[in-house]
UniProtKB/Swiss-Prot annotation:
Purpose of the protein: Forms part of the ribosomal stalk, playing a central role in the interaction of the ribosome with GTP-bound translation factors.
Subunit note: Part of the ribosomal stalk of the 50S ribosomal subunit. The N-terminus interacts with L11 and the large rRNA to form the base of the stalk. The C-terminus forms an elongated spine to which L12 dimers bind in a sequential fashion forming a multimeric L10(L12)X complex.
PROSITE patterns: RIBOSOMAL_L10
Gene this chain is encoded by: rplJ
Name assigned to this protein: Large ribosomal subunit protein uL10
GO CC annotation: large ribosomal subunit
Length: 166
C-alpha cells in the first residue's frame, strides 16, 4: 500500500480514538474567523484542557462510522473544527458558545456528549449550565444550610438560658 493511504488510516484511527475518549465533542464552522481570532479561541480552549483540531471531512466521516456515530455525517460539510474534551463536559460548549456570541462567524453545528449525538440546541443548553465547580459549590451550600440553621438554633437556646440563669 502507498504511504498516503497508511497515513490516512492513521489519521482516521486517531480521530476515532479521540471520539471514543472524549466526554464532550463540539463541532463548529469556523469560516470567516481570521488568524488572530482563531488563535484567541485556541488559547481559551487550551487553558480549559480542550483539544481543538481541524480534520478533513472525509476522514472524519470514516472515523465516525468506525465509532458508530454516523448520524453526524450531515454536519460535516464545509470547513469544520472539532473541540474534544476528555475531562469537563461543559467546558467546550461554554467556551465556544461565549466566543460565538462575540464572533458571529463561528457557528456551532452539533456534537457528541458522553457518546450520544447532540444537536446545536443541546450544545447551547449545555453551555448555559454552570461548571462542575459551580455545581459542587451549589450542592455544598444546600447541604450546609440545615446544619447552619441547627447550630444557630442551639446557640439561640444557649444564649436564652444564659440570660435566664444570670
Amino acid at each position: 500500500m502507498s504511504s498516503a493511504i497508511e497515513l490516512k488510516k492513521q489519521v482516521v484511527a486517531e480521530i476515532a480514538d479521540k471520539f471514543r475518549a472524549s466526554k464532550a465533542t463540539v463541532i463548529v464552522d469556523y469560516r470567516g474567523l481570521n488568524v488572530a481570532e482563531m488563535t484567541e479561541l485556541r488559547k481559551q480552549l487550551r487553558e480549559a484542557g480542550v483539544e481543538f483540531k481541524v480534520y478533513k471531512n472525509t476522514l472524519t466521516r470514516r472515523a465516525l462510522a468506525e465509532v458508530g456515530l454516523e448520524g453526524l455525517d450531515e454536519v460535516f460539510t464545509g470547513p469544520n473544527a472539532i473541540a474534544f474534551s476528555n475531562e469537563d463536559v461543559v467546558a467546550p460548549a461554554k467556551i465556544l458558545s461565549e466566543f460565538a456570541k462575540t464572533h458571529e462567524a463561528l457557528e456551532i453545528k452539533g456534537g457528541v456528549i458522553e457518546g450520544n449525538i447532540a444537536s446545536k440546541e443541546e450544545i447551547d443548553a449545555l453551555a448555559k449550565l454552570p461548571s462542575r465547580e459551580g455545581l459542587l459549590s451549589m450542592l455544598l451550600s444546600v447541604l450546609q444550610a440545615p446544619i447552619r440553621n441547627f447550630a444557630l438554633a442551639i446557640k439561640a437556646v444557649a444564649d436564652k438560658q444564659e440570660e435566664q440563669g444570670a
